[in-house]
Structure formats: structure tokens, C-alpha cells
Amino acid sequence: MNAAAFDTHKFQVGRSDPRLAECLKEFPAATFNERLYQSMELMERYSIELAVDLLGQLNLAEQLGAWRSADELCSVLDFQPRFRLALQWILARLVESGCLQMRDDGATRSYRLRNTPWNPDLKYLRALGLNIDPANAATLDLLDYAASAYPAVATSRQNGDHNLFGPQGISLWLNYFHNDNLTYAINNWVGAAAAVDRLSSRPMLRVLEIGAGAGSATEILLMLLSERGLLSRLGRYVVTEPNAYFRRCNQRKLATQFLNLPLEWSAVDLDLPWSEQGIGSGEFDLVYAVNVMHISKNLLFSLNEARSALAADGWLVIGECVRPYDNQPIYPELMFQILDSFTDVETDPEFRPNPGFLTGEQWRRAFLKAGFTRTEVAPDIERIREIYPHFFTGAICGQNTAIAK
């Protein structure tokens, strides 16, 4: 791709491929529409613009006259080792834009300046994004805030968690995770639709939600259960969130919005034995989590803990930001990859080759490794990526058939 093709003021979003709507026809209408498609395209382009801006802020261009790997750049620029993953993302985005070229010898990826970067115009793209949907401000604000922390995280021992979860950051996260923000809410809609489809034939519903945050995923799941006439079957819904502030926000909102439901709130750390945190074996028909499992320190441990909590033939359903192809950079990573909780995980070459977001194939392998012999991914993200490679949402579903009678 030539960098000239990325002229900011020539950026336009056309209409989505009709085949994409066909792939999503079984999901609620709120899941996807043209406004969301245009918003997603805008966010991808905006994140590339931020990468070009960071190229200058981090003084990368002057070091890329010769081939350099991310590790070499970290060394020569005295960046902290923890910044390597974020730096790799910036470099990959710049390859997409035509500013850099990349070579891969099988062990190391190296980069070199190919074209002079353009002058980024974030204000112009931001105005376009707000014109598409004023609610896009939530994602744009968080992208800007996260990018502004990159230089400090790169050059100091202060981690991204400290920068992004301070007083200003918390309000931005709450806005981002809100269901009014369609670019995030799609994760909640896809996860909830997949979960409800797998619960609809059960006479009694016992639900455990892990990492519920401020409750946007819980809200959509309860709404869909209500629309399908299933709330009367809800025998128990345990909403867990380790962050006390988010948990209080969750409880205040949902206890008022959904009266007379058997909702419970507690704290569960997915990296510690669940049985020691009040979660009994075989107690639930559904274990549910949206954009949580990818931060598990030991993914197989957490998946096995989830399976242990399930009744015979119960389902684990996780809504996840899914990477369409191996090594494909995607815009949501900009907000998360300077967080230690996102990057400080145990990797595995078979099913978790990198921290953060995984592909559908990698999730399937992880579920199978954890004993979920019946594993499904919805929608058909392998088909969708051939039509639209910027669709990043999927629900990975595994049934506890190993102990089913």
C-alpha cells in the first residue's frame, strides 16, 4: 500500500457488502447496521492515524533508515521491555499504511522506512466519526487518551494501568463499555444472542457471569432473556466483578433496572481457584463472560475452572474481540496493550501464541484443550473475514459434554 493512498482528507466509507448482513441475519437487529459498519471503518483508519502520530512522538522514524526489529528499537531508544508489544502494533499499522516495509526471517520481524509519513489530521477524522454517530466519542476519547500515555509508558517505569485507570481514565472506560457505544456494544449483543440460543430449551436457568464490569453485558443478556420470555425460568444469576467500584456501579444500575430477579453480586478472580471464592462445582447452566477470558493469566486454568462450575451439558459462552487473521493489528488493541493485565499472561504456541486477542481457530483449540469437546463459534467469523476483515466480534461456545449423562 502506498502511503499516498492514505491521504486523510480523501478517506471515505462506502456501504458494507450485502453478504455481511446475510452472515448476521440470525442475530438481533441491534447487532449490526450501516452506521456501525461506518464507525468500525472510521476507528480502523483513526488508529492508523494515531500510529503515524506516535511514529513522530516516539522518534521512531529517525531510527528506521536501516532494518530494525521491535527489540532493537526498544534498546536503541531506551524503551521499557514491556512496551515491545505496543511498539510491534504501531509498526504493523505503519506497514499497512505504506510508511514502513517489513521482512520476516521466520524468527524476527524487522522494519524499515519506506515512504515519508503524512501529517496526521486526527481532528478531521474525529469530526467524521462524530458525524457518523455522536456516540463514537466514547471510543475516540479512549483511543486518544490511551495514545497520549504511550510516550510515558515507553520511557518510564510507570505502567499503563496507572495511566489509564486514574480518575480521568475511569470515566472514559465507563463511557466506552456503555451500550450506547455501538462499537463496543456489538460484543455484548453477539455474546448474549449466542448464550440465549443455547439456554432456550432449559426449564431452569442458573447463570454465572465472570468479569461483568459495570454491567453492560449483563444488561443485554437480561434484555434478550426477557424478549425471549425466559426470565421466569431464571433461578439464579451470580454477577461477579473483582473491581469494587465497577461492581458497585453494576449493582446500583441492574438492581434498579431489573426488579425482583434473583441477582447476586460477588468478586471472583478468574486466575485463582473458583471453588475457594464461593463458586461450587456443577452449579450453573451457563458460565458467561464478555471480553474477559483473554486476560486470564493461565487460559487453560480459567477455562477448566469454568467447565468445573458447569452442570452436565451446561455451556460456557464468551463474547470476545476476535482477531480475524494471525498477526493482524486491530484498533481495539491500542487501548489495551499497554495494560499489564492484558500483556502479562502465559502464552502457548498451539492456542495462545500472543497476549491479547486471539483468532477463532486459536479459541477453538483452547476450548478443546480444556475439555470442551463440543465447541462452536458464532457468527461464522471465518466466512465473514473473507467478506469484511474488520469484523472483530465472536462468541466462542463450549458445552460440558464430558460429564453429560
Where are each of the predicted segments found?
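A short glycine-rich, Lys/Arg-flanked "PGG" loop and its adjoining helix->strand segment in the class I
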Residues: 300-315
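A short SAM/SAH-binding and catalytic strip from SAM-dependent methyltransferases
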Residues: 284-300
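Local beta-strand N-terminus motif with an aromatic residue
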Residues: 204, 234, 283-285
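C-terminal alpha-helical "lid/dimerization" subdomain adjacent to the S-adenosyl-L-methionine
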Residues: 319-370, 374-380
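A short acidic, Gly/Pro-enriched loop at the edge of an enzyme's catalytic core
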Residues: 274-287
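N-terminal accessory segments
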Residues: 1-182, 188-206, 371-377, 381-384, ...
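Class I SAM-dependent methyltransferase SAM/SAH-binding core
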Residues: 206-208, 212-273
